[in-house]
Amino acid sequence: MRAELPKRVVVERGALQFLPEVLRELGCSKTVVVTDSGVWSVVGSVVEGALRGLAYEVVYIEAADNSNVERARSAARRVEACAVAGLGGGRPVDVAKYAAFMEGLPFVSVPTAISHDGFASPIVALKDPEGNPLSIFTRPPAAVLVDLAVVSRAPRRLLASGVGDIVGKVTSVADARLAQRLTGEEVPEVALRMAETAARMVLDEVDEIASWTERGVGVLAQAGLLAGMAMAVAGSSRPCSGSEHLFSHSLDKYVPWKKSLHGEQVGVGAIIASYLHGFNWRVIRDALAKVGAPTTVEGLGVTGEDAVRALLKARELRKRFTILDVVELNEGLAWKVLRETGVAPTA
């Protein structure tokens, strides 16, 4: 087993102030900061103060797609950058991560919300020209800076989405172990333990997280870090992405007009997948409810019919063995699962 992990991790109030120190440790005096205008309006002055005396260029993006990746790459070449920083939520982080990877530069992750585990992982989520999702394995961040003073002020919905994404590791790990037993698939045990621990941290501390204190948000950030590193150790998203993610991706494909977030969908998918695994799905449902995350199709803004279709189509989306390959789902059983878990209302 070989793994590349972040060289520096700071999760505390004021972590943004460590950005110049991290860049110096990377031997870097010129950088590109990828962000969006909303994030910059909130924390831009802090970043400007931290980077005073260093050469940098700010690239504002609106979408995580190849055109914005190319803009970030062009900026990196123009200023002769020796690192690329992603400041913000999922989109700026993904664009910066992929631009850094394509340019052969270290990536510094500076999340302003913990809406999923992507801020610490080697995985990039982009959209192709047709709007279809792309998942690309790159390199993990060289450094991760989570400023709790900033992240704890993020919209509650984004943080609740992060809880949904992390508790989904309960079922992604179960799916990986199922694949090990039934197909002989190899997944490093340490990666599975890391992902398992991430989920357990959030479930054990959900009351503190639901209070949205810096300590609670810090637990969520640490769990996200652990999940991201689990993927780096495994060399794939396998420990952290199973049937619950397939359900989410299926919703993205078959209900593209919905407004739900990735982690919200994964959380509901984890309720369903826990039921299929024979787990106590109420533990996940109750944790999601405590932080205000959706637990029903109504909460996701989709219909029961949408969810049934997504569930039945989920296993077709990628070649990854999960509980969906074991349980012989049909429309009637899918409705039964959704109704018994309360994800869909009873008829």
Curated annotation (Swiss-Prot):
Keywords: Cytoplasm, Lipid biosynthesis, Lipid metabolism, Metal-binding, NAD, NADP, Oxidoreductase, Phospholipid biosynthesis, Phospholipid metabolism, Zinc. GO terms for biological process: glycerophospholipid metabolic process; phospholipid biosynthetic process. The keyword NADP applies. Substrate binds at residues 117, 165, 249. Its cofactor is Zn(2+). Binds 1 zinc ion per subunit. Belongs to the glycerol-1-phosphate dehydrogenase family. Homodimer. Catalyzes the NAD(P)H-dependent reduction of dihydroxyacetonephosphate (DHAP or glycerone phosphate) to glycerol 1-phosphate (G1P). The G1P thus generated is used as the glycerophosphate backbone of phospholipids in the cellular membranes of Archaea. This is Glycerol-1-phosphate dehydrogenase [NAD(P)+].
